């Protein structure tokens, strides 16, 4: 084996050896350190040495090339075609060895100073030239000082003809092991303490070229310098300018204001009964109607004896005192789609009024109020019966209207009125199907409101007769009223209108007697609707004058007073006040007979 050296400028010269195989091939091995280590930081030998350590910078790179030929000048490069395995082992040694003093005992070996990965396999790369390369990106030194690296090349042959020539004397060494081929040393480099370490520099172009071809090399594109307060930085002007820029960026980040959070979305719908400024908007989408909702309504149950047969929809979800909302359908009250979300008072609703909100589309826009004339009230009362209801498809209404037996419940603090107090409005006249279907056309809600004079004339010309309200009759033998009359609602006006029924004026002829029945209707559309009935019943006046002591039974007057008060407020576009239902009934006991 013959070794030769070539001149190298940046470090020690490359090393080349020559050998002859068993098959007669002459091979030349040339190894060179193409990237020399320059500096590193001492990592120490404590428990934190493995976690906080800096590798040798830049990482050492060793190049290997293999040639075949009779002479090196005529040799051919066979690095990629030669069938063998190579690896390089690195060791650390001091650049200036120190002589041992005179000691009597044996020399104690120092602990290892090199740490990291000292072994590297050969990588076949095309750049910078086609050759085999050994990289050491993870080498660290424990103590500060000046050192150099020593690289030893080992080879494992694959073919028997590529093995070394057999020696003249047989050896007892086992077959099939690695052969040590050559050794090369790196240039000297310094290891600094943590306080004096200048920092890691940028990655070299050779390291970037290696990383681009898939090797595991750490790439640093910024300078990592240690900045000391009050001292000029050793990194130059670029590091100082970068530090100033970083300080300015940090100050700008601190001056920035925090991005305001978006306002919270109002997921909950505001109730229209608690506020007067609630906007009219469509309700949230409800559930899809089930198959049971599309079924035709069942036939109505037969009413109890002595009561009129009146059916009302039972699908409304608003209840008053346990009774379904709109269970007593006699007077019609137009509502909008927003009424489905209104809060309901705990006071039970008056039996003389009901809402047809269940007959409107659930997502329909609010409609303007419509005055409820006697003809409309009568039609609405009859339209609640299932026989007069037209068959409606599921596309017209979100929920079907199913009939159920009507229940009547009373609050414990209310008094049930007697039958004669309401009997003057219980008679009903025949109604044609055309009047019941008129209320289901949207154009009916947009009709112009007639003047009050037309209403009075209509009231005097045709007085409707309504069916009796289903109230249990008390055990009081009171005479029936002399006449039956029906009040009429007036259109909305800024100022309240007060008048008395002209029918009574015609009957009385301008005279008012205390024992005749009379009605007082006071209407206030600005904020509420008040309906008062006062009836005074007494015996029919006879031709003979009453006794002086007034002891005769027919001279004793029996008076019965029923007062009904209802306050109805609509949404903002109709009335400014919130929704309230007030139902008051009072009954005065007749005076005791002497």
Swiss-Prot record:
Q: Where is the composition biased (Basic and acidic residues)?
A: 374-383, 405-416
Q: What's the name of its gene?
A: VEA
**For bias kind Polar residues, which ranges apply?**
352-362
Q: What is this protein called?
A: Developmental and secondary metabolism regulator veA
Q: Which organism is it from?
A: Pyricularia oryzae (strain 70-15 / ATCC MYA-4617 / FGSC 8958)
Keyword check for Lipid biosynthesis, yes or no: no
Q: Which residues form a coiled coil?
A: none
Name where it's found: Nucleus; Cytoplasm
Q: Where is the composition biased (Low complexity)?
A: 327-351, 384-403, 523-538
Q: Which family does it belong to?
A: Belongs to the velvet family. VeA subfamily.
This molecule's function is given as: Component of the velvet transcription factor complex that controls sexual/asexual developmental ratio in response to light, promoting sexual development in the darkness while stimulating asexual sporulation under illumination. The velvet complex acts as a global regulator for secondary metabolite gene expression. Regulates of the response to reactive oxygen species (ROS) stress.
Keywords tagged on the record: Cytoplasm, Nucleus, Sporulation, Transcription, Transcription regulation
